[in-house]
């Protein structure tokens, strides 16, 4: 049996990509952090809109010998390096995450990761072995997204592709659909309970190691 780790040494990086302070996405971030905190693990929040993160990958950020990240990316890379669980929270806009989230992938997660390394199936030195949790939301229903091929495209591009390209240990994706203004508080609370359960499960995996599939709820995708 795996010896439990000291929870105070376990860190989660929560990357939030929604501009609305009163949004359900912000509620997800707060709830996840609160639940992980109850388990005495550490979370750090990177609110991309709050810090006005620049999503544009500049020419001098392309992976070349002597690569040196810009200061904002260097600080983000330090956050990633310290974390074992990367948590992405974003809405689906026009079938994809917001540009600010894609820019985070380009500039931070993909920093100094070359096409040659990608084609050779070499994992990212910064991300290999880390775990990814995604919470996404959409105003449209899940069946509507599936009918138009958007759900499959997103899953392949952000779940399967990123996990394999960067050498992540796993990806657990929970999606909440039909998220619109004026949601019934009971509906919101039901969804936030799913967030709490997911936070507990992911924190447990980090502390105790991989658990038998029967003890873990299956990913919601």
Report each predicted region and the residues it spans:
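N-terminal beta1-alpha1-beta2 submodule of the flavodoxin-like/Rossmannoid cofactor-binding fold
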Residues: 1-114, 190-221
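FMN-binding flavodoxin-like domain, especially the glycine-rich phosphate-binding loop
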Residues: 99-221
């Amino acid at each position: 049996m795996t010896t439990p780790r000291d929870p105070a040494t376990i860190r989660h990086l929560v990357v939030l990509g929604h501009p609305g302070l009163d949004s359900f996405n912000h509620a997800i971030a707060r709830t996840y952090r609160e639940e992980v905190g109850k388990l005495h693990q550490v979370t750090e929040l990177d609110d991309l809109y709050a810090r006005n993160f620049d999503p544009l990958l500049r020419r001098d950020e392309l992976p070349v010998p002597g690569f040196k990240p810009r200061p904002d990316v260097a600080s983000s890379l330090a956050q990633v390096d310290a974390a074992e669980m990367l948590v992405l929270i974003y809405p689906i806009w026009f079938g994809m995450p917001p540009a600010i989230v894609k820019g985070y992938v380009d500039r931070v997660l993909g920093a100094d990761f070359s096409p040659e390394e990608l084609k050779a199936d070499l994992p990212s030195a910064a991300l290999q072995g880390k775990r990814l949790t995604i919470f996404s939301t959409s105003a449209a229903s899940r069946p509507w997204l599936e009918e138009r091929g958007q759900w499959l495209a997103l899953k392949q591009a952000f779940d399967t592709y990123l996990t394999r390209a960067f050498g992540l240990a796993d990806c657990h994706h929970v999606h909440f659909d039909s998220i619109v203004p004026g949601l019934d508080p009971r509906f919101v609370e039901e969804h936030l309970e799913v967030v709490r359960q997911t936070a507990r499960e992911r924190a447990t995996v980090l502390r105790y190691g991989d658990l038998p599939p029967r003890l873990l709820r299956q990913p919601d995708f």
